[in-house]
Amino acid sequence: MAATSTAAAASSIMGTRVVSDISSNSSRFTARFGFGTKKASPKKAKTVISDRPLWFPGAKSPEYLDGSLVGDYGFDPFGLGKPAEYLQFDLDSLDQNLAKNLYGEVIGTRTEAVDPKSTPFQPYSEVFGLQRFRECELIHGRWAMLATLGAITVEWLTGVTWQDAGKVELVDGSSYLGQPLPFSISTLIWIEVLVIGYIEFQRNAELDSEKRLYPGGKFFDPLGLASDPVKKAQLQLAEIKHARLAMVGFLGFAVQAAATGKGPLNNWATHLSDPLHTTIIDTFSSS
């Protein structure tokens, strides 16, 4: 009994010890340890939007797509943005008088709401979490908007389709809008790699996820269009909508180029010349 009392009064530097099932005729007791227990830091409250428009009428949005992200319409059919779910186990049996201690049983599940941390090194689940997918979506969408505009503009001004632009540069030499450039193709490639690489390194050096996507300032918002929070939210929504449309549109450009070998303007003119007989169905059925 004295040993039991001494154990119960032991220092709690290494953890918290809970003593139970102590009887006067036995020195057996069950101990639970909580090593390094810390108070959980308060989490940011999420803005939950109810009755918001969804990607499909009558669709049910997943719990993790609560509308807090701009342009969130509850679309994630493959569950790619679903946060990791962890099993909670009870503590293993710690009775030294037993021949075999039993493992702790599963007592529940726990899902962590991952908040982006200001660190260049993040766990796998955070790097490929919902916030990371949004960053990739927006960056790819911006590139797609530039590519879509570039493909249409170049074909309109020069008649060269976007898929043949590289061939023309290799044969006729590097040029811009018909004007020759004093650089070879290999030199231009190195310039592009170095410039874009430097820009991407600088962007990823920003640890604040909001500033990494929307840097603002005199270089990226010289007119101060995002100074008003309400207008900023509207512009962010318009941008993500146009970005998604541009990604789908350029995918259509690629499919058209593979099927017909023509550019988007040429395909559009061909379709307008005979709308009833020049469609995507006719194109793939005749190929």
Swiss-Prot record:
Q: How does it sit in the membrane?
A: Multi-pass membrane protein
**Statement: the UniProt record of this protein carries the keyword Transit peptide:** yes
Where chlorophyll a 1 is bound, by residue? F75, E137, R244
Please indicate which superkingdom the organism of origin belongs to.
Eukaryota
Bilayer-spanning residue ranges: 143-163, 181-201, 245-265
What residue stretch is labeled transit peptide in the record?
Answer: 1-31
Q: Name one Pfam family in it.
A: Chloroa_b-bind
Q: What GO MF annotations does this protein's record show? A: chlorophyll binding; metal ion binding; mRNA binding
User: Which keywords fit this entry according to its UniProt record?
Assistant: Acetylation, Chlorophyll, Chloroplast, Chromophore, Magnesium, Membrane, Metal-binding, Phosphoprotein, Photosynthesis, Photosystem I, Photosystem II, Plastid, Thylakoid, Transit peptide, Transmembrane, Transmembrane helix
User: Which positions in this protein are listed as binding chlorophyll a 5?
Assistant: Q256
Quaternary form?
The LHC complex consists of chlorophyll a-b binding proteins.
Domain comment text?
The N-terminus of the protein extends into the stroma where it is involved with adhesion of granal membranes and post-translational modifications; both are believed to mediate the distribution of excitation energy between photosystems I and II.
Family that this chain belongs to: Belongs to the light-harvesting chlorophyll a/b-binding (LHC) protein family.
Provide the protein name.
Answer: Chlorophyll a-b binding protein CP29.2, chloroplastic
Mind giving the lineage of the organism this protein is from? Answer: Eukaryota, Viridiplantae, Streptophyta, Embryophyta, Tracheophyta
